Amino acid sequence: MAETRIRRLPVGIQSFEKIRKDGYLYVDKTDIIWRLANTDNTYNYLSRPRRFGKSLLVDTLEAYFLGKKELFEGLRIIELEKEWVKRPVVRLDMSQAGAEPESVRSYLDDVFHTLEAEYKIVVRQDCSLAVRFKNIIEGAYNKTGQQVAILIDEYDAPLQHSWKTPHHEACTSIYREVFAILKANDKYERFVFITGITKFTQISLFSVLNNLSNISFEPEYAAICGITKEEMLRNFKPEIDKLAAYENHTYDEAVAQLTAYYDGYHFSHDNMADIFNPFSLVNALSDSKLRNYWAASGATSLLPKFVDNIEIRLKNFENCPIDSDTLETSDVTGGGAELFLYQSGYLTIKGYTDGIYILGIPNYEVRKALYKIVLPALTLKTNDQVISTQSMLLYNLQLGNLPEAMKCLKALVADVPYSNKKLASMDMEERYRLILSTIFNAIGCRVEVEKMIATGRIDMVVETIHIIYVLELKLSNNGGIHAATQQIQYKQYAEPFKADKRRVVALAIELDDQGKGLVDWKEA
């Protein structure tokens, strides 16, 4: 019997050379990469969310400019590139530079020292970082006779992490000093490529390089990072089959699950091809499990720095309009919460009309992560208190064990509408809807608030894997449990869902009109 060859998926690998030499699966993007490397624009900037393949893209560009043809054999670029010229490459990975001016200077000093040794550049003791950078670019050109490729990966990492700290202005000053020389040295530069997540326009990368081409929204580069559905189906069929077997699904059901969890990103209104988060997708296919990989990797750590009061604003981001100038050109520190959430991957483009983008949450993984993060702040509880209770709530909802589920829900809601002063501007029913929908989203349920059907408007529909819950909420001073039960029965709220193979449970819930929490419940 022939031995089955185990395919190697590049989980967390950002080295193009390692992927190619060690036999890892590579989704071929080299035709797009070649077009980028040979564009008429010398200076190019790409923004993509964290863990979206930017560093692998930079590493692939480095291999290309170093003329490493052997790494590209069998890929599309072989048909496009005829010369394979070896060029000098200056590469900076600013994610290694820390978040304080001393660490940024130390990182640049180390990189420059290595390059100066490589190109035999004599450095005066009093040389500034900017002068050293200038001398490296000129020296590399003079020694090789070839223009230099400059690759700056995660340029914004020190600026993000120092934001709202005493170190931010000093870090910004270093950027202004060092990177201002890029334009002055343009005759020595073949290609300059800068990647990041957020855009800080006050630094010299954007203010001095007025001819910097922002390719982040260009349709031809929409899929340069990430994995399209076509690429997933073409490259990962064995892994999808394996996931389907583990989850007891058909192949098509497994594809639908992967799509719901990790797909849904769009980066150009002129090219709305769905893009999967590559980090999450490859991890899921490697593990044969559907998990929240992106959030678990620390992707949500910067939210509190850039978005105030997100726990009460999150519902506003579901279908969020933002004008094109703000989304495409604004500084993250002054463009509002929507801009940061888009650049960081929490929101994506859902539509576009007459200069206005419509943004929304891309997929299940991001939705659950966002709501899970805001739940402790909204309920005024510690993370530890919330985690154990919400786990028990989901467990009992999935089993249909309503008495235990309602105990958990009561514990999470208790006193919150009254005690959380950030909710003071909302009426009491609106407070309860926000709290309950946040809880159900945070545990991974599919939630629809105020769902319209032929006979009326259902307060909330909550879907688990095996059960659909139809909720009618009534305050104690508005009829309470009796009125909620009557409305469910009279308007036949459960009927539209009975064609679903899942069990349907209609729940009447009475809520304290003073904001003290859940008073009573009844299966209607």
Give names to the regions the model predicted.
Residues 1-428, 443-445:
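Phosphate-binding site recognition
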Residues 140-144, 439-465:
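Active-site metal-binding core of divalent-cation-utilizing nuclease and nuclease-like domains
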Residues 149, 467-471, 505:
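Structural motif
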Residues 169-175, 475-494:
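Mg2+/Mn2+-dependent nuclease catalytic core
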Residues 178-185, 339-347, 437-442, 487-507:
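Metal-dependent nuclease catalytic cores in nucleic-acid-processing enzymes
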Residues 436, 460-477, 491:
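Conserved catalytic cores of phosphodiester-cleaving nucleases, focusing on short active-site segments
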Residues 496, 500-524:
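Domain-level recognition of nuclease-like catalytic cores that cleave nucleotide substrates
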